Amino acid sequence: MFHFFLKYHFFLFISMAPRYYLTLSQVCSQVWCNKYTIAFVLLAVKVYTFSLILRSTLDHLMDLVDTINVSLDQFASTATNFPAQLTQLTNKLIAEQLQQLKSNFKLSLLLLVSVIRALIGFYMEIFLGTFTCLLDAAAQASVNFALDSAQATLKCLNTTIVSVTSEVESGLESISSFIENSINTVSSLFTNGKKPSVTSINLSLGKLRNLQIPGSVTNELDSFRLNLDEFDNLKNSTINLLTAPLTHFDKNVSGSDLFGPIDSSKMVVANYGPSAAKNVTFDLTEVKNSIVDFKNDAAKIASIMIIVLASLSVIAMIALVFVERRNFVKRDIFVISVREKSSPLAIGNALETYQNRTIYYMAKLKVNPRYYWICNYLTSKYAMVVIIIGLVGVISFTLQYRLLLSVKNKLKNLIDTVSSPEQTKQLQASLSQYTAQTNNYIEAQSKALNQNLLGWYMKASTNVNDTLTDILHQINSTIHTVTGNTALSKPFEVVVYCVIGRKIVAVTKGITWLNEHLVIDLPQLPVDLFKDVTEAAPLRYGKQLETQMVKATNSLEHMLFIELYVALGFVGIWVIFIVMGIIFMFFPKKRTIGSPKLLTKTEKEEYIFPLSSFNTSSSVYSTLNDRPIS
């Protein structure tokens, strides 16, 4: 309470002193240095310096783009000349490899043909030769037995026939004499001694004396035995027919120019030179122009922010002029109110209303007076310094971060432009000529091998296949010729099909499968051979640019967030003031005071205290304990 008495005494004192307060014009001469204007000016300076840092970063990125452009041009030049240099180095190696491949393939084919030819003779000997041998043995044994039996039987039969014929003829002669005598006797009885008309009766075998079984039967058996040699002829002719195409193929392969030496200088790929490739240069001018546009946009945004902040500072100065003018009006009102008030508490409240604008406006708005104290506590000069610094820091962060984001989002699009520029596709198209020419040459070699080499094999295998098909017909025809319509014909044909025919059918199927699948397919270069190479360098440089960009933006972001954290720290202190104010408001410190000391005569005169006698007992002042203590 003594504090309020001092304030009251002070105002009384200055009322009798000469004027030393500033007039309105004098205050307005310094209003341009108000804290709001200074804050806005500092924000403008901060935005300007940050824009300079950002533009310097963009200049560094633009220099990096120039370096990347030069590196990409060197890469394009090297990549364009690489196929020609590679051709000169590898043509001889390719020719040697193709020559070795052809030689090895030729040797393999000759060995394969020799093996097939030997296997054909081996299988024909196994199947047809074995069957012929068995058939010949069986037939020879049967014919020899039949021939020997027929000769013995014919000899015996002919001897028996001759003996029987002689005996029959002798008996017939006796019978003939008897009959003739009988006829003569009877005839003389009936003819009166005349001579009979039948002179003689001759009973004989006549030509039957020479009756014998002809020897042609044994001749036919000999012919059957000799015809068995047809199976040997069939076997030999079959082997010759089957191996004839292979022999022809062997001669063609051995004498072909296809397997001759390859001249690497005459290879089609050797004609590929630097002039064959399209000259490709990387031009990142568009990227540089984009960065320049970003710089201009950043400068434009920074200029707008600075202009806005400068305008706000001017507005703050103008507003404060009106505020100061109102303060003088409020001062007059305060002086009048102080004259009318005698209570120190009322004088103190009037003084705070004059000094604190927040309470002044709350009073004008007729806000509940119970909230005046907490507003006064939170808007004191110490609390306002904290919250203003915090808010200025937050606003500064917002403006600078907005400026950084405007550039950062646009820079991300440049990474794709550098990582996969249009020139990469042109370079790939240029280098694909080398791949196409090389693949055409390899394909031509494959066609030559398939036509000139495997064409002979196809023809030979087709002839072998056709010959195998005719074998069964020849075997059946030979069996029919040998056995004729005998009972051995059908069994022999069945045995031949089971022993030989089924194998021949399997062989023909195998040859047909080989004809369909035997194709020389030399490996070719991948179509995208240079794709990874041409894309790797732009991707690497794009990654380098991205790394530098991210590093720069992250550094700026880190700096801005440090400012934000500091500003939020000041705001946090002001929040602590809020908590402390709530504690003070709802938990006031209670204390008990004693009776006030009596004023001396001099003090009474200074404070214009009434000097009349009055009760100064402590009971009079005991009611002060119930008054609010400031």
Curated annotation (Swiss-Prot):
**InterPro entries (alphabetical):** PRM1 (IPR026777)
Give the glycosylated residues.
Answer: 158, 202, 236, 252, 279, 465, 476
Manganese as a keyword? Answer: no
Compartment(s) of residence: Cell membrane
GO biological processes: plasma membrane fusion involved in cytogamy
Name the family: Belongs to the PRM1 family.
Record's protein name: Plasma membrane fusion protein PRM1
